[in-house]
Each structure stands twice: as C-alpha cells, then as structure tokens.
Amino acid sequence: MVKLRLKRCGRKQRAVYRIVAIDARSRREGRDLRKVGFYDPIKNQTYSNVPAILYFLEKGAQPTGTVHDISKKAEVFTELRLNQTKFKFNQ
C-alpha cells in the first residue's frame, strides 16, 4: 500500500518536511516513490504538486492525518471530486 506522508528534512530544531509518496512498510526516512510537496511549519509555507497528489490518490494511496489536513487547505480533494465526476460522465 502506498501512503502520502511527511518526510523530515532540515537541521536540528528547524524541521521542514517533504510530502512524499512512499510504501507504507518503509520507515519515515526511507526511499520514497516520488516527492509531491513541501511543508515548512515554522514559516507556515506549503507547496503541493497537485497533479502528482491526484495521481496517487486515484491509484489508492492513503494520506496520513497531517497530509490530509495540508491537502484540504490546498483544496486538493475538491479537484479530486471534480475529476471523478468528469470521469463518470465520460463513461
């Protein structure tokens, strides 16, 4: 199973996180499948590669709680619903 979760980067006391698609059995710092975003909690900055996140969500990836909240703020799930309705109408 693939998960969308945070991977810690940065130095001591100055953590920044990458949002990555990674196998659920891998450790936090393990090899990721793809980097799909960035989150800096200190500066409160976020970058999300929305097409990549949508790709993994459509393939069945499960976001962790924090990644879910970050994606909700970036309105990724509204775009996912729009893509699903377009897909249903095309069939």
Curated annotation (Swiss-Prot):
Q: Which UniProt keywords apply?
A: Chloroplast, Plastid, Ribonucleoprotein, Ribosomal protein
Q: Which GO terms describe its biological process?
A: translation
Per its UniProt record, what Pfam families does this chain match? Ribosomal_S16 (PF00886)
SS bond list:
none
Question: What Gene3D superfamilies does the database record attribute to this sequence?
Answer: 3.30.1320.10
Q: Where in the cell is it found?
A: Plastid, Chloroplast
Query: At the top level of its lineage, which domain of life is listed?
Result: Eukaryota
Gene Ontology CC annotations of this record:
chloroplast; small ribosomal subunit
- What main location does UniProt list? plastid
Q: Which GO MF terms does the UniProt record name? A: structural constituent of ribosome
Similarity annotation: Belongs to the bacterial ribosomal protein bS16 family.
- Write the protein's name: Small ribosomal subunit protein bS16c
Q: Which organism is it from?
A: Vitis vinifera
Gene, per the UniProt record: rps16
